[in-house]
Amino acid sequence: MPLVKKAKEMGLEVHCFAWEEGAVCKDIVNYFYPISIVEKEEILKICQEVDIDGICTIASDVAAPTVAYVANKMNLVGNNYEAAVRANNKYQMREAFVKVGVPCPKYMMVTPETLRSPEVIDALREFQYPMITKPSDRSGSLGVTKIVMPSQFYPAVEFAMEKSFKHQAMIEEFVEGREISVEFISYNGVHYPLQITDKITTEAPHFVELEHHQPSTLSDEMFTTIYDITKNALNALGLTNGASHAEYKITKDGRIAIMEIGGRMGGDFIGSALVRLSTGYDFVKGVIDVALGVFVVPVKTLNMCAGVYFLCKETEHLKSIVESWSDNPAFVEGEITDTELREVTCSADRSGYVIYQGKTKLKV
């Protein structure tokens, strides 16, 4: 919705492709097509008939390859299709990082056919518990599990493969440390850093995100280091245009490990709201400008704090705060999205949120 609303605000004719069920943009776009976002040939045909001027997505990993494919075929501004596919596969991503020395956790990929093979069993000797398993091609904490003992290994990996589109699971070294994410916007291979976010998650086994706060409390020196690593990671993947969102762990002894990077802005309101609230830069408009080939170098006009708290069973003390968010001038938006509060295993299990902006971090 933020992308569609911004495009309409800019006076653009908006064509949207999505599954019809739950398509919240259906009634406000100029043209809606009930087509799966992975149907790249069908989408390309329509885009060619319309003769579009640009194509983009802001928070969908699944849509990113289709966006790149259409842009490439129509000579529009976008990422290379192969790069977009690479950024959508955690194994290919890690392989690209290792080739150029981008620091990341130890990893391997398994499939149902290889999981119990002698080669995989032998390779696992290089890992120690705890470890992490996750689908190779999903986001939003879906299918992510921390494995702390051998008896959990096969059920957790099989769970990750079930959640994967391609039935592939990553097995990773578990890195203990603080979590951050990084927002960039790129145009023609030049990468512009926008913000770093501190992240708070649930404990093991699923690590679902509960809070995001900008800017991070990292030192200026660490900001520079993280930005430099992210630029190298973007170059390694071949991502040259549009938004990107990188996730990191930083250990107590200062080790930095990039977990993954996506060719889209951060979800959970990070890209669509928090960057603008903390820096003054309209990230969503920037993504549209890139797609149209009219990009302007970002200018930060604010130096504020902004953040979001999510409501779920683990944070049920927030319920009254979210319900009455408009009574507090520090809050800019809030909503109860589900009256049932569930213990979360993925981001979709959360039941509401509240967003703040202020001169300092707001603790609730």
Give, region by region, the residue ranges found by the protein language model.
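ATP-binding N-terminal substructure of ATP-dependent carboxylate-amine bond-forming enzymes
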Residues: 1-83, 113-115, 295-297, 340, ...
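Active-site nucleotide/adenylate-binding loops and adjacent lid/helix of ATP-dependent enzymes
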Residues: 89-170, 176, 188, 216-228
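Peripheral (often C-terminal) accessory segments that flank ATP-dependent C-N-forming ligase machineries
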Residues: 99, 121, 286-364
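ATP-dependent carboxylate/phosphate-activation module, predominantly the ATP-grasp catalytic core
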Residues: 151, 173-239, 243, 250, ...
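Conserved protein kinase catalytic/activation segment
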Residues: 254-256
